[in-house]
């Protein structure tokens, strides 16, 4: 699976969620991990936090990013 395809799949599966790595690289995580973790993550003010290998990773809701001017 290409990364861009995985991102599209992730967005479709997680109610308009985009991984933070698309906007600003935090850590590299395999797309399948992002998809499964986004479903289980905790949401707060448009941000989803979860832990991968002991490191905190964030997802951001697309509308949250648009409001902040991060994406068009």
How should these model regions be labeled?
Residues 2, 55-72:
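A short, Lys/Arg-enriched interface patch at domain edges and termini
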Residues 5-37:
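Polyanion-binding surface elements
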Residues 26-58:
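Major-groove DNA-recognition helix of helix-turn-helix-type DNA-binding domains
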């Amino acid at each position: 699976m290409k990364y861009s395809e995985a991102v599209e799949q992730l967005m479709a599966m997680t109610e308009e969620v985009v991984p933070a790595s698309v906007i600003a690289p935090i850590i590299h995580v395999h797309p399948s991990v992002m998809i499964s973790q986004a479903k289980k993550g905790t949401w707060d003010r448009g941000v989803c936090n979860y832990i991968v290998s002991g490191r905190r990773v964030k997802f951001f809701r697309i509308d949250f990013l648009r409001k902040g001017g991060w994406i068009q």
